[in-house]
Amino acid sequence: MRKTKIVVPIMLTELAELEKVSVSDYRTADIVEWRADFLSADEILEMAPKFFEKFKESKILFTLRTVREGGNIQVSEKKYLQILKEILTYNPAYIDVEFFTHGPSFAALKDFRDKMVLSYHNFDEVPSDLTNRLIKMHEEGTAFVKVAVMPERECDVLDLLQITRDMTLEYGDHFISMAMGDLGRLSRISGYLTGSCWTFASLENSSAPGQISLKETEYILDILEK
Amino acid sequence: MRKTKIVVPIMLTELAELEKVSVSDYRTADIVEWRADFLSADEILEMAPKFFEKFKESKILFTLRTVREGGNIQVSEKKYLQILKEILTYNPAYIDVEFFTHGPSFAALKDFRDKMVLSYHNFDEVPSDLTNRLIKMHEEGTAFVKVAVMPERECDVLDLLQITRDMTLEYGDHFISMAMGDLGRLSRISGYLTGSCWTFASLENSSAPGQISLKETEYILDILEK
């Protein structure tokens, strides 16, 4: 059994697209991430029942990636919370909550911590306070803590691997980390060493810079995690 | 062009085997390593002219890996030096010299430093003095400095990646490092980050624990070094 779980995002830009999606394409994904932020708020709530019905055999991670954290949707705090609350009624395996951008929503959803992937994305750099941010997020007691950062130099990637390892040794196996871009690719396949629990792999178009395809990720992890 | 060069070892155990070797199997290897230590000293010297003729289109690394450094041949210092001297007459691209095990031979061959892969192998651990050993080896001014060590824990591998990166930044692009065993596999494909110049990949049977096949290594490096 593979140590690092593979999450495959699905990014639908129109309601009609859901029908064309072939669930079997996602059959080897450990988790399907519905990156809902390619739709409007109303479209998300309209699509939700059909999406969760269609993927009822899959573990679903619901993610509303906002513009400030590199995503596509711009919503008020109120609307962000409202969408997450409604999605929770469909009982997804996990929901992503942007800790530093949507603190109030996180506070309002604390009862669902066992479903939460508390996330932080930095598309500019690997911030020097990353360790403190990770500890802060860890202390909230969510299922997972996820960080995605942008390395500027090789050492940034190596530092992230080391930080993830230290966090895992210190606080346990619930961290997910990735360095984005071409430089960061190694971080997407090094979970067996660092303890990073998940890796995000694309079916076709990637949902973040430096992402590797599902097929390639499976091939590489099967070699590294022999 | 691939940043990390792929070295493929060839380990012949009998004189008659050379004829059966298909040179085209090695055509995508950047360097062919003749791991001669699977033969006796006399067999090596007898095979040499045919080997160098057969692989005249390839860059050849000649390696006599002694028992003390994880290899198969046990020879006196005198015999070790005699073999290397004779092999040098065939003008291989590189020769491996075990720095800490065969210091006198290294001293006697200093004129060939531009062909030398100065090597150190530790099959037990990642020694705490690894950085000092690397600096000491670097100071000898050889073409490459190669270390292969055995990690006991995940942090050992991450430390090796960091040390290799630091060495490369400090002293330039002539280090080759690998952590052996299953744990160390990531180090065999992370040259684009650490600066490790070569990786050793097997055609079929691996010549060191944790080695990845040539085909797999090419596939992975083409993804990571995009």
Swiss-Prot record, chains A, B:
Residues at which 3-dehydroquinate binds: E33, W34, R35, R65, R188, S207, Q211
SS bond partners: none
Matching InterPro entries: Aldolase_TIM, DHquinase_I, Type-I_3-dehydroquinase
Pathway terms, separated by semicolons: Metabolic intermediate biosynthesis; chorismate biosynthesis; chorismate from D-erythrose 4-phosphate and phosphoenolpyruvate: step 3/7
The EC number(s) this enzyme carries: 4.2.1.10
Pfam families (alphabetical): DHquinase_I
Keyword Amino-acid biosynthesis in annotation: yes
Record keywords, A-Z: Amino-acid biosynthesis, Aromatic amino acid biosynthesis, Lyase, Schiff base
NCBIfam families in the record: aroD (TIGR01093)
Function as written in the Swiss-Prot or TrEMBL entry: Involved in the third step of the chorismate pathway, which leads to the biosynthesis of aromatic amino acids. Catalyzes the cis-dehydration of 3-dehydroquinate (DHQ) and introduces the first double bond of the aromatic ring to yield 3-dehydroshikimate.
PANTHER family xrefs: 3-DEHYDROQUINATE DEHYDRATASE
Subunit structure, interactors included: Homodimer.
Protein name: 3-dehydroquinate dehydratase
Source organism: Lactococcus lactis subsp. lactis (strain IL1403) (Streptococcus lactis)
